Amino acid sequence: MAATHRLARGFTGRDHILTCGYHGWVNAMGGSGVPEAINSVYHALPWGNLSPFEAAFDELGSDNIAAVSVACSYADIELGHQFLPALRDLTERHGALLIFDEIVTGFRLARGGAQQYFDVTPDLAVFAKGMSNGVPLSAYLGRRDVMEKVRDVVISSTFGGDTLGLAAAQAVMAIYERENVIDTLWARGLRLHEGITAIAGRRAVPVGMAGLPPVGQIELPSAEARVALEGECLQRGVILYSVVYPNFSHTDADVDQALGVIDEALAAVQRRGLLD
């Protein structure tokens, strides 16, 4: 993501970046240990509400904002149907670039990520993770005129010449050509969503699923309950995180096993009084 931000600044000649969502290390650009000069040009704004972005353009001035950089909020991702086209229009009106963080959504929500699912084309995008089945690799891409600015912008990587990730990506692309990966991810995710929802209903606990099936998220009443659930699942052989992402290698039997473990884990958390 940092590469696209530098490229956007080089292309537009502007300094400020409006960010939305989780960009990994880039989120820390506005945090502790970062010089105020850098903090001052990153502005984190909420998902799904255009008003703060409009206000930022008014306050900072159109000539000062290089880009709006967006990662979808997975719990309420469907707001993207209205929010992302509105951001596309806003950035075009002000001459800023629109950047999509497709590190999670790419090759998962749709093969082309959020831009394909929501039918909104950004100026720049970043893909990783799914494109190489977890082997370290990332790629930034975009409009030809913007990408040509790479010649004038210093972007380097210690492992940029490594070929293992490229070989992994080549193998992954071949599987995407042969197999119906995306539909499988949606089907496995739906099975998880429906299963967890049914378990919570049967146990009468305040636990639910948010987001879309390929990028689902378990909602619990407290952070303590979440940590407890993850620990109970881990003890039973299932690694669970706040997000519940199926992958193509998971079978129906794997999903059933995970649901059985989640059922037992929720019962244990309930006995501890964390789901009252």
Residue ranges of predicted features:
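Active-site PLP attachment segment
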Residues: 119-149, 161-168
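Helix C-cap/helix->beta junction micro-motif
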Residues: 93-94, 203, 236
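Conserved PLP-binding catalytic core of the aspartate aminotransferase-like
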Residues: 189-231
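Active-site core of PLP-dependent enzymes with the aminotransferase class I/II
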Residues: 55, 72-94
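Structural signature of PLP-dependent enzymes
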Residues: 172-197
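A short glycine-threonine-serine/GTX helix/turn-capping micro-motif
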Residues: 152-161, 177
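PLP-dependent aspartate aminotransferase-fold enzymes
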Residues: 1-67, 88
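PLP-dependent enzyme catalytic core of the Aspartate aminotransferase-like
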Residues: 177-179, 235-276
